[in-house]
Curated annotation (Swiss-Prot):
NCBIfam families registered for this protein in UniProt: GroEL (TIGR02348), PRK00013.1 (NF000592), PRK12849.1 (NF009487), PRK12850.1 (NF009488), PRK12851.1 (NF009489)
UniProt-listed Pfam families: Cpn60_TCP1
Chief localization: cytoplasm
This protein's encoding gene: groEL
This protein's name: Chaperonin GroEL
Native species: Pseudomonas entomophila (strain L48)
Biological role: Together with its co-chaperonin GroES, plays an essential role in assisting protein folding. The GroEL-GroES system forms a nano-cage that allows encapsulation of the non-native substrate proteins and provides a physical environment optimized to promote and accelerate protein folding.
Length: 546
């Protein structure tokens, strides 16, 4: 085991503070409408330019082990805020820096760190409750666009495209962000349920100009196993041919003679048919087949529930207005499922989302929910260069998280004003002793930090602006983009309440823990001996000289 270096008391805290300040100073340069960019070198490819706090924080590693511990703890603040609300990482970092700096001054003056932390926790709980009171629901498209614009660093086009996407697919709908090929941002919306499986044979194509298979008013046969024997399929095929309607088969796979027979029947026009693999794998495939069954009013033919292909009848098949199959995707439009069944299925998926602890599972469940409840919107980000594309895509993703958070918990006045207004909740708050009161006072000063930093980044005097904002009331604040004072809500400067709340909670949690640090342990750097001189090698080829 490697030897360790241990530091105690003030010498440990001073080192930690250096790391905190290095990381926070790099991150806080990006805050506000006039925040600057940070350039990150990559081990391969072009450098990345970003204004996203958590991206900057993730890149920072310091050489000194004790300083690096401080930096890593603040990085954790940014990550926690990002995980909770998807935005507000820079605000969280600025708050954490202010709490740690103020707190360590109090500890150096002889205050008890544990009581300081208790005071900070009390004040944080009161401010969080006040933020909930201050928040107003984010109901209309205009408010959603404003939140998106502010989060995307005052880029109106991003705010507007997100509001448009939410209007089209609903607030529950899935909105994905992709890299576009043009200069402008584009929005495309997929109506109905789409999954990423295409036709099993190009011979199913009936629109050769676009290479798609389109079935009007089809029946859907949903099977949770492989189909390779055509005999199993014959009863259903005959019934469908008599009904004179097209058929879409969704199964684990269709292969061999079964696929060949379907292709031949389709080409001869005996029965209009297409086949596609079921989406997903394992249990997720079963769940998605059940989703399609609910959407189309059919039943999954599964031996688990005592149904087999030979006994399947037209009653077991689903119905839809139209199905479009391309090489990569299948879209089911206007399924004939009962609204009550679809709602029950949506409720069930929502309950699973609440219970799951895995981010991956949650994302997949939300995709399933959107396919049932709304649709899927794709925002294609346009830019002039690859570097700008990456920077812009990160901003769009941030703005999307912010708007979702706003829809969830409402909005508060932006620009750091909400935190200043929430101070009213701790104006008369008292701790159990004098040192807890110092912790409460410390947080009172720290929550002004985001407002002061936004002002400093805009090139104005933080103390003057903070003073004037504190003298005002309600939504009165400072618009750093224009240098004007006024009603923040009317000026369209909104923050999601969830983002502000998560930023403060993450900062207070980790800031409080750092104040109570008394010892730090790190690996000692290994002293590697200098490499010796390489040998000269043999003097080959010089034989015969003697």
């Amino acid at each position: 085991m490697a030897a360790k270096d241990v530091k105690f008391g003030d010498s440990a805290r001073k080192k930690m503070l250096v790391g905190v300040n290095v990381l926070a100073d790099a991150v806080k340069a990006t805050l506000g409408p006039k925040g600057r960019n940070v350039v990150l070198a990559k081990s391969f490819g072009a450098p990345t330019i970003t204004k996203d706090g958590v991206s900057v924080a993730k890149e920072i590693e310091l050489k000194d082990a004790f300083e690096n511990m401080g930096a890593q703890l603040v990085k954790e603040v940014a990550s926690k805020a990002n995980d909770a609300a998807g935005d507000g990482t820079t605000t969280a970092t600025v708050l954490a820096q202010a709490i740690v700096n103020e707190g360590l001054k109090a500890v150096a003056a002889g205050m008890n760190p544990m009581d300081l932390k208790r005071g900070i926790d009390k004040a944080t709980a009161a401010i969080v409750a006040e933020l909930k009171n201050l928040s107003k629901p984010c109901a209309d498209s205009k408010a959603i666009a404003q939140v998106g614009t502010i989060s995307a660093n005052s880029d109106n086009s991003i705010g507007e495209i997100i509001a448009e996407a939410m209007e089209k697919v609903g607030k529950e709908g899935v909105i994905t962000v992709e890299e576009g090929s043009g200069l402008e941002n584009e929005l495309s919306v997929v109506e109905g349920m789409q999954f990423d499986r295409g036709y099993l044979s190009p011979y199913f194509v009936n629109k050769p100009d676009t290479m798609v298979a389109e079935l009007e008013g089809p029946l859907l046969l949903l099977v949770d196993k492989k189909i390779s024997n055509i005999r199993e399929l014959l009863p259903v095929l005959e019934a469908v041919a008599k009904a004179g309607r097209p058929l879409l088969i969704v199964a684990e796979d269709v292969e061999g003679e079964a696929l060949a027979t379907l292709v031949v029947n389709n080409m001869r026009g005996i029965v209009k048919v297409a086949a596609v693999k079921a989406p997903g794998f394992g249990d997720r495939r079963k769940a998605m087949l059940q989703d399609i069954a609910t959407l189309t009013g059919g039943q999954v033919i599964s031996e688990e529930i005592g149904l087999s292909l030979e006994t399947a009848t037209l009653e077991h098949l689903g119905n839809a207005k139209r199905v479009i199959l391309s090489k990569e995707n299948t879209t089911i439009i206007d399924g004939a499922g009962a609204d009550g069944d679809i709602e029950a299925r949506v409720k069930q998926i929502r309950a699973q989302i609440e219970e799951t602890s895995s981010d991956y599972d949650r994302e997949k469940l939300q995709e399933r929910l959107a396919k049932l409840a709304g649709g899927v919107a794709v925002i294609k980000v346009g830019a002039g260069t690859e570097v700008e594309m990456k920077e812009k895509k990160a901003r769009v993703e941030d703005a999307l998280h912010a708007t979702r958070a706003a829809v969830e918990e409402g909005v508060v006045p932006g620009g750091g004003v909400a935190l200043v207004r929430a101070l009213a909740a701790i104006a008369d708050l008292k701790g159990d002793n004098e040192e807890q009161n110092v912790g409460i006072a410390l947080l009172r000063r720290a929550v002004e930090a985001p407002l002061r930093q936004i002002t400093a980044n805009a090139g104005d005097e933080p103390s003057v602006v903070a003073d004037k904002v504190k003298q005002g009331s309600g939504n009165f604040g400072y618009n750093a983009a224009t240098g004007e004072y006024g009603d923040m809500i009317e000026m369209g400067i909104l923050d999601p309440a969830k983002v502000t709340r998560s930023a403060l909670q993450a900062a207070a949690s980790i800031g409080g823990l750092m104040i109570t640090t008394e010892a730090m342990v790190a690996d000692l750097p290994e002293d590697k001996p200098a490499a010796g001189m390489p040998d000269m090698g043999g003097m080959g080829g010089m034989g015969g000289m003697m």
